[in-house]
């Protein structure tokens, strides 16, 4: 899980949306 203010998740360029790390979310 992740927090809204977290942009990077893992080592990929992902962001946090709905407490989940996703690719290319806004």
Swiss-Prot record:
Similarity comment text for this entry: Belongs to the neurotoxin 30 (phrixotoxin) family.
GO molecular function: sodium channel regulator activity; toxin activity
Domain notes: The presence of a 'disulfide through disulfide knot' structurally defines this protein as a knottin.
Function: Gating-modifier toxin that non-selectively inhibits voltage-gated sodium channel Nav by shifting the threshold for channel activation to more positive potentials. This toxin moderately inhibits human Nav1.2/SCN2A (IC(50)=404 nM), Nav1.5/SCN5A (IC(50)=218 nM) and Nav1.7/SCN9A (IC(50)=333 nM). Inhibition of Nav1.7 is voltage-dependent, with lower inhibition at more positive test pulses.
Source species, domain of life: Eukaryota
UniProt entry keywords in alphabetical sequence: Cardiotoxin, Disulfide bond, Ion channel impairing toxin, Neurotoxin, Secreted, Toxin, Voltage-gated sodium channel impairing toxin
Ranges that cross the membrane: none
Disulfide bridge partners, by residue number: 2-16, 9-21, 15-25
Protein name: Mu-theraphotoxin-Phlo2a
Originating organism: Phlogius sp. (Tarantula spider)
Compartments reported by the entry: Secreted
Family matches, as SUPFAM superfamilies: omega toxin-like
Free-text tissue specificity from the UniProt record: Expressed by the venom gland.
GO cellular component, one term: extracellular region
Lineage: Eukaryota, Metazoa, Ecdysozoa, Arthropoda, Chelicerata
């Amino acid at each position: 899980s992740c927090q809204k203010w977290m942009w990077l998740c893992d080592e990929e360029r992902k962001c946090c949306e709905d407490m989940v790390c996703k690719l290319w979310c806004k």
